[in-house]
Amino acid sequence: MASTPQIAVVDYDMGNLHSACKGLEAAGANPIVTADPATILAADGVLLPGVGAFDPAMDHLRDRQLIEPLHQAATSGKPFLGICLGLQLLFEASEEGQSAGLGILPGRVQRFRSEPGLVIPHMGWNQLQLQQPDCPLWQNLGADPWFYFVHTYYVVPSEPTLTAATVQHGSQPVTAAIARDRLWAVQFHPEKSAKAGLQLLANFVTQVAAAQLQTVA
């Protein structure tokens, strides 16, 4: 019988981790807040959260020698979830700064274009348009669920098949989530998205537990 899923929550001083940890705990996981590469690589799953600016985030990851461990974790088949800035960092670069991103996924991060009547940042609840309806993150959420967003930049994947959900902000379609194998990432904040957010975190924990069972078997 597999033990409680251990999920490394990467701590690089770019956001409050408490709410996400509570959501993981509620779903039956043991979140481990850590900046230790060995702990990240040994965990059953990894959560990369983050709020703030792209360049300082990459600097913090580099200072903690987390670039290579995150590459390994995200490409190993281990369940991996990025949230908000944690989504953007997975890509190659951002209009917000000069630093290269992690480059795990192809594409760039760009700023919303100004248009009449459009409020930037995109802040508040928005309804997803699911591009990968069978993505495990959407289980038990119903069609086109609502989530809470706060962001000025968004990812533009070079491979359209990466996109798992979009939203509309003004006239601009926005990538709200990506999925490839067991690598998932979302622009919205599950930890601020009430029942839907808790369900999404529970879905991630379910995937971590399933992968853990496969490893044990």
Swiss-Prot record:
Enzyme Commission number: 4.3.2.10, 3.5.1.2
Cited InterPro entries: Class_I_gatase-like, GATASE, Imidazole-glycPsynth_HisH
GO MF, one annotated term: imidazoleglycerol-phosphate synthase activity
Residues at the catalytic site: C84, H189, E191
Ranges of residues in domain Glutamine amidotransferase type-1: 6-214
Name the record gives this protein: Imidazole glycerol phosphate synthase subunit HisH
Reported function: IGPS catalyzes the conversion of PRFAR and glutamine to IGP, AICAR and glutamate. The HisH subunit catalyzes the hydrolysis of glutamine to glutamate and ammonia as part of the synthesis of IGP and AICAR. The resulting ammonia molecule is channeled to the active site of HisF.
Pathway participation: Amino-acid biosynthesis; L-histidine biosynthesis; L-histidine from 5-phospho-alpha-D-ribose 1-diphosphate: step 5/9
Taxon lineage: Bacteria, Bacillati, Cyanobacteriota, Cyanophyceae, Synechococcales
